[in-house]
């Protein structure tokens, strides 16, 4: 079984995991591809289900930022639904998946801890850029996929 996790944020990413083990980790940065390219990539991965982070507008964000965020969410939801032939796209709030994977910190430290947990669970995953900086969209997408894969296996 293959499960997809999507972080729809501005620096978002898509991750597909295979239930056969942590060796298969496919990652795609959303900010670097067109929606069509993202669909083609996801279609080739053949996910059985898709989990998208259920996020909403944030207080203090500008109207322009909120609009862009909503637009990204709509695009990835459509891509996901088409890639899994119209099946239901599942959602999970950050609070739920972060608790599930063992995040214990708050605020800006969350991104670092999520990456540390992801590296332990999936050491083959490339979560860092060419200069060594964390690509937090990848880490989030990976942990959303991890959450989804474990939920699917229990059903």
Over which residues does each language-model region extend?
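Phosphate- and other anionic-substrate recognition elements at nucleic-acid/protein interfaces
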Residues: 1-155
């Amino acid at each position: 079984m293959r499960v997809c996790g999507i972080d729809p944020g501005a620096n978002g990413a898509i991750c597909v995991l295979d239930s056969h083990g942590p060796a298969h980790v496919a990652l795609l940065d959303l900010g670097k591809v067109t929606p069509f390219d993202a669909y083609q990539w996801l279609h080739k991965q053949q996910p059985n289900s898709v989990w998208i982070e259920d996020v909403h507008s944030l207080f203090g964000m500008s109207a322009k930022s909120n609009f862009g965020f909503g637009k990204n969410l709509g695009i990835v939801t459509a891509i996901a639904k088409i890639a899994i032939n119209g099946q239901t796209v599942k959602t999970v709030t950050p609070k739920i998946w972060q608790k599930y994977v063992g995040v214990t910190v708050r605020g800006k430290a969350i991104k670092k801890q999520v990456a540390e947990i992801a590296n332990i669970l999936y050491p083959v995953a490339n979560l860092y850029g060419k200069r060594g900086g964390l690509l937090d969209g990848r880490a989030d997408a990976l942990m959303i996929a991890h959450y989804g894969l474990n939920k699917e296996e229990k059903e």
